[in-house]
Amino acid sequence: MKVADKLPFGNAKMISSAAGYFDGRTDHWKQNKKLGGGAMGDMGVYALQGARLATGEEPISVLAKSSTTRPNIYHEVEETMMFQLEFPSGALAACHTSFGIRMNYLQVNYDKGWVKMEPHWAYSGNNGSMSDGTIINYPLENQQAKQMDEDADSILNNKPMIVPGEEGLRDIRVVEAVYR
């Protein structure tokens, strides 16, 4: 979200974010409640982070609805989760996640423009466009190795983590609110 920090479009007003894929497996930990399964705690975090990072705020209100089209597979956990977030600034986000639907996008509408990313999470890079005609292309190579190297450098050199554990805690607070 380095792009969002530098945008001339004003404040985020409306966000639409989705992360999901079709998972045909029928016996996997992601379908087991005791093991932390469910789309929200896995792919839903990507949709959630898109909204959180676009606004720079933590949500103050959550409304959610889960559904399952394959109850024979997803009888303990949700296959799909739709959730709406409200932020202190008044910005609203409509987020979706699923193990039954392929989706991978983020659109942020600002006071004076928009940003679209599709895909907004991918191992091979993220692409998008802005209302001013700017094209966004962030190629990624082996991002997990890069993050592990940066984490090790932070520990060895007493520098702040690029993605500190507190970010995960913020995500989990919202994930838990979605499930309530």
Q: What does each model-found stretch correspond to?
A:
Residues 35-42, 134-142:
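A short glycine-threonine-serine/GTX helix/turn-capping micro-motif
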